[in-house]
Structures are given as C-alpha cells and as structure tokens.
C-alpha cells in the first residue's frame, strides 16, 4: 500500500520473527506490521510472544497489509478474492475470517505506521515518534 511508513528494520524483523514463531508453532502464520489503535478498543484476550527484537501479540483483525506464506495465500485465495468482489463492512471481512483458523500477530510496538485519518479507528500507532520516522524516510 502507498500510505505506510516503515521502520528500516521492518522486513528483517518480520522475517526473523516469522521463522521463529512459525517454527515454534509448526505452522505458517500471518503477520501485520502495524500496531493499530483499533486493536485496543475491545477487551479481547491475546497472547504475547517473543519475536526477534520485540514482543508480538495475537490479533484477530488486520487491514490489507500483512506478511504470510504462499501456502496460506493459496489455501485462502477465495477469501482474498471475495474481499475484492463486492462491497462489505468491514472491507477486510473475508480476510478477518481467516484468523478464526490461523495465527496472526502484530508487533508491540509498531514496525510500520499507516498514515490514515488520525480520527479513524485505524488511527496512528501508539508510542511512535512520527517526526523522527518521517525524517528517516526522506
């Protein structure tokens, strides 16, 4: 997507954490690079995991920016396809259905920030120095 800023270590950390967590679980996983404010709106139970350089937590919702394996993309291709075929609320409805069956995690604190409407539930990730991140990405 074109409205994210990524920390320089984002890909490296996500790949290292993917390898660590998926090998511990013995299965492929989904990973979201952002820690969204909407993840704090419900009193949803979560698990905290140790990643490569930070903690991660299990989540049940993402937007459309995530990392996963080709195996899981192929397995859930119908969900991704249905997500684009018609309008529904939320937009990610069919993607989020996947997380009822599969493991999805997001970092604490964020490796990417979604530069969206700060007043939306997606908002800006907490505890980020946005000026520094912007300057690093010039």
Language-model segment annotations:
Residues 5-79:
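Conserved catalytic core of nucleotide-sugar-dependent glycosyltransferases
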Residues 1-2:
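Short acidic donor-binding/metal-coordinating loop in glycosyltransferase active sites
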Residues 70-138:
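C-terminal catalytic/acceptor-binding lobe
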């Amino acid at each position: 997507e074109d409205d994210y800023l990524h920390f320089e270590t984002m890909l490296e950390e996500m790949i290292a954490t993917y390898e660590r967590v998926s090998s511990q679980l013995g299965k492929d996983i989904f990973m979201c690079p952002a820690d969204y404010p909407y993840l704090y709106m419900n009193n949803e139970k979560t698990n905290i995991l140790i990643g490569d350089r930070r903690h991660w937590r299990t989540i049940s919702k993402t937007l459309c920016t995530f990392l996963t394996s080709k195996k899981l993309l192929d397995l859930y291709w119908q969900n991704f396809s249905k997500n684009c075929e018609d309008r529904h609320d939320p937009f990610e409805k069919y993607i989020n259905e996947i997380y009822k069956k599969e493991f999805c995690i997001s970092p604490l604190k964020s490796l990417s920030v979604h530069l969206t409407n700060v007043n939306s539930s997606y908002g800006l990730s907490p505890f980020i120095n946005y000026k520094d991140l912007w300057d690093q990405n010039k």
